[in-house]
């Protein structure tokens, strides 16, 4: 059975998108030199940020994979659950939101920001136990 976790919308993510929108608006209002082009770039970055903030999902599939889909514009990442070495919650600081650091494979690291942090880590452990029971 598939289980999907949605991305946690953080204050830092919202602040970044608002800042990009304000800079884009300022660049469009000034209209001197290359500022309209800079405003357009900020607008595109803001749109990509909104997509990533709202459409990121973390899906545990029935065949033992964790699929991290970082929005409609971003690339998806597939990690086999039995390759996950560690998953630990990291408290956010001033500029970073709370997130989960996932260590997998041979020294590879990625992050996740699901809404239910403890349930996400429990789901990883449950799927790993389920995979080990299948092997035995």
Give short role names for the model-derived ranges.
Residues 54, 68-120, 135:
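Non-transmembrane, membrane-adjacent beta-strand/coil modules in membrane-associated proteins
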Residues 91, 128-131:
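A general structural signal marking secondary-structure boundaries and capping sites
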Residues 4-6, 57-61, 67, 76-78:
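Ser/Thr- (and often Asn-) enriched beta-sheet segments in non-cytosolic proteins
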Residues 23, 40-52:
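Single-pass alpha-helical transmembrane signal-anchor segments
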Residues 47-64, 70:
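Transmembrane-cytosolic junction motif
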Residues 124, 131-136:
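Charged phosphate-binding loop/patch that engages nucleotide di/tri-phosphates or the phosphate backbone
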Residues 32-40:
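Short, aromatic-rich membrane-interface segments at the entry and exit
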Residues 1-31:
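N-terminal membrane-targeting/pre-transmembrane regions
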């Amino acid at each position: 059975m598939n289980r999907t976790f949605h991305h946690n919308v953080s204050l830092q993510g919202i602040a970044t998108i608002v800042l990009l929108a304000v800079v884009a608006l300022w660049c469009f209002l000034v209209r001197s030199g290359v500022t309209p082009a800079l405003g357009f770039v900020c607008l595109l970055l803001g749109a990509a940020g909104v997509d990533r903030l709202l459409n990121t999902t973390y899906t545990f599939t029935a065949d033992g994979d964790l699929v991290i889909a970082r929005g409609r514009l971003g690339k998806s990442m597939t990690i086999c659950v039995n390759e996950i070495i560690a998953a630990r919650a990291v408290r956010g600081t001033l500029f970073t939101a709370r997130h989960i650091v996932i260590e997998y494979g041979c020294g590879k690291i990625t992050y996740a920001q699901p809404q239910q942090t403890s349930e996400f880590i429990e789901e990883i452990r449950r799927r790993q136990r389920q995979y080990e029971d299948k092997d035995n």
